[in-house]
């Protein structure tokens, strides 16, 4: 059942369940609870994948370890790791495990762990930070800026289209996000909605990036944080460096409407499909809060008589639940969905719900390469960058910052985990002359990860 969450009073009471975590998402993964077993292993008996690199020689083990997963399973995995080892390996993790509470839950400061994550590196990052702080009394977390940008773009495109129609909204996505026109950001979103409703050209400049969409609906530029945990007594992570990257067409590319009909005195329908429960709950909840702020701003001002009906559904960090929740939003007639959080849910939801129902999907954190390759008729966008880029960033950090020459990977057994592991491995070996000894898959929700840790640390020879 779709829930109307348009009331500020309800939003204020929602609370924040951790602002620093997330999972790719973050890259891939709302697919957590329905990941499959490897071909030759069931339950916790995981085996290395056939796509892994050289197993290396002997039992000396790798210099570094890449772990790709989500916070809930990460707790047990890292407990097992620290109980089995002296913690001497350099460990690199992506955004999916960026949860400041993890060291306390694991019972170890995790000082040997470094992370990478898409950063809030947009031109209007500070304006968003202030809005989030004012609304919820806490600092924003990972992928919250991307969530705000997704919802804001959906509202602006709808205002420009003048109707709650997926195809009409799709045609306006690049027109309102890519150059040129009136520059709009979180700080003047209300004025931007009014301009879009009046048929004016606008250029949304986001909190997470410039939000220029390329021909695939991916961000044309992105920034990445290199970050560390602050220890067992903290609930935070610290970004120690931020690096910016641009694609071949930093101003964006792809089909776009030449003009927008606009329209006044109407209701914009917005769907929000993110995880309130399941493996990504701790990071999904702040993302939901961020996605609600654009609607709050518009409803308080009613520019050109525009109001926003924001409706939320919980993916439960599960592909089947995410598809069912998406169907609920489709039945409610939403033309645009901010979601989902992970590629494990985003891919099936897009294929089974958004694309056939001609609904625009714009994920704030689904980063798997498979999203780019969807046959989507241009209905699927995202404000988070592809793991094509994050895999390169991770390989560079592992080689140049952490100084590792031999590495094993441990990855959650879904599109996000497998594709990011393979992308990292390819770049690490081809561009940085490293050796990937083995790539080992693991399932979400296991009671022990000792066997997969042993396999990774022995280079797959155990």
Language-model features, listed with the residues they occupy:
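Extracytosolic ligand-binding ectodomains
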Residues: 2-22, 26-462
């Amino acid at each position: 059942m779709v829930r109307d969450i348009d009331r500020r009073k309800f939003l204020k009471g929602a609370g924040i369940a951790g602002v620093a975590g997330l999972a790719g998402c973050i890259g891939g993964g709302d697919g957590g609870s329905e990941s499959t077993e490897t071909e030759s292993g069931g339950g916790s008996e995981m085996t290395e994948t056939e796509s892994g690199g050289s197993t290396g020689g002997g039992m000396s083990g790798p210099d570094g370890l890449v772990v790709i997963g989500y916070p809930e399973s990460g707790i047990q995995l890292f407990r097992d790791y620290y109980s089995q080892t002296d913690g001497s390996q350099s460990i690199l993790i992506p955004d999916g495990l960026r949860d400041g509470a993890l060291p306390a839950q694991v019972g170890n400061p995790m000082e040997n762990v470094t992370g990478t994550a898409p950063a809030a590196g947009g031109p209007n990052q500070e304006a968003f930070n202030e809005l989030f702080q004012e609304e919820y009394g806490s600092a924003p977390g990972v992928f919250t800026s991307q969530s705000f940008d997704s919802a804001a773009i959906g509202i602006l495109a709808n205002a420009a289209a003048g109707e709650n129609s997926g195809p009409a909204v799709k045609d306006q996505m690049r027109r309102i996000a890519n150059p040129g026109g009136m520059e709009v950001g979180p700080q003047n979103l209300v004025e931007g909605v009014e301009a879009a409703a009046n048929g004016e050209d606008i250029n949304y400049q986001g909190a997470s990036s410039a939000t220029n969409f390329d021909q695939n609906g991916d961000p044309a530029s992105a920034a990445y944080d290199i970050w560390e945990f602050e220890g067992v007594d903290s609930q935070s992570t610290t970004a120690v460096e931020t690096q910016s990257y641009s694609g071949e067409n930093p101003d964006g590319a792809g089909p776009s409407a030449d003009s927008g009909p606009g329209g006044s005195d109407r209701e914009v329908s917005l769907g929000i499909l993110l995880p309130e429960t399941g493996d990504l709950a701790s990071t999904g909840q702040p993302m939901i809060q961020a996605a609600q702020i654009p609607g709050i701003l518009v409803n308080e001002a009613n520019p050109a008589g525009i109001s926003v009906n924001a409706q939320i559904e919980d993916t439960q960090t599960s592909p089947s639940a995410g598809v069912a929740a998406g169907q609920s939003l489709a039945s409610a007639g939403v033309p645009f969905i901010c979601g989902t959080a992970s590629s494990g849910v985003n891919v099936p939801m897009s294929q089974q719900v958004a694309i056939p129902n001609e609904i625009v999907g714009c994920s704030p954190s689904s980063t798997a390469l498979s999203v780019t390759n969807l046959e989507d008729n241009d209905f699927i966008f995202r404000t988070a960058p592809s793991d094509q880029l994050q895999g390169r960033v991770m390989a560079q950090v592992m080689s140049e910052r952490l100084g590792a020459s031999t590495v094993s990977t441990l990855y959650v057994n879904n599109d996000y985990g497998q594709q990011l592991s393979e992308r990292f491995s390819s770049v690490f070996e081809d561009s940085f002359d490293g050796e990937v000894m083995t790539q080992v898959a693991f399932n979400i929700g296991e009671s022990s990860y000792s066997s997969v840790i042993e396999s990774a640390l022995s280079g797959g020879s155990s």
